[in-house]
Amino acid sequence: CLSNGISESNIDAYYKEYAVPNRFDNADTIFVKRMLQHVLPEQLRSSIAENMFKEFVGLSAAEFSKELYMSVDEVKGLVNSGMYVGSHGSRHYWLNKISPEEQEKDIKQSLNFLEDVGAPTNDWVMCYPYGAYNDATLSLLKKYDASVGITTDARVANLKADNPFELPRLDTNDFPQ
């Protein structure tokens, strides 16, 4: 980071702001996650992640992704087998950290993907990456005919009382292992 114009005092300030433990991660872990998710400039985040993959995993991020994530054909297979596939964004951005224009581009790209795999693009569901959204996100979901938005608020939804664009959910980690 130091060679990319981010000083030690910046790092210290970032640590104070972002190293806040949550229900899943300790302070150090969440600090690294936040730096690589949205705090550092995107190009620097990508470079750090790529170097970490090569050093600790022994593969490039792209090679690892091919093993970890479903292929387009596998997603099409889910849809063809009757599974519902909704949106999680195109680039997995914290939507509340990007401009409304960038949000719209990301949502449209995601809808194009859903269309390509045969998933519905009217009355569709958005599961916000990291649970992050804002008023611009909600407006865009309505503009593009979404029916539901799912947050990371950890509780059971009350479909009669909760805003359909701000539904809570339980994470798999919320259940006994």
Where are these regions (language model features)?
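Short beta-strand segments
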Residues: 53, 86-89, 124-130
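C-terminal active-site subregion of NodB/CE4 polysaccharide deacetylases
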Residues: 9-10, 22, 47, 80, ...
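Glycine-rich, flexible loop/turn motifs
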Residues: 66, 91, 163-166
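Histidine/lysine/aspartate-rich catalytic loop segments that bind and position anionic ligands
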Residues: 71-75, 79-102
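Extended, charge-rich helix/loop segments that form flexible
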Residues: 1-81
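A near-ubiquitous, low-amplitude feature marking generic local secondary-structure context
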Residues: 15, 19, 35, 58-61, ...
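Conserved SAM-binding loop
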Residues: 52-53, 91-95, 116
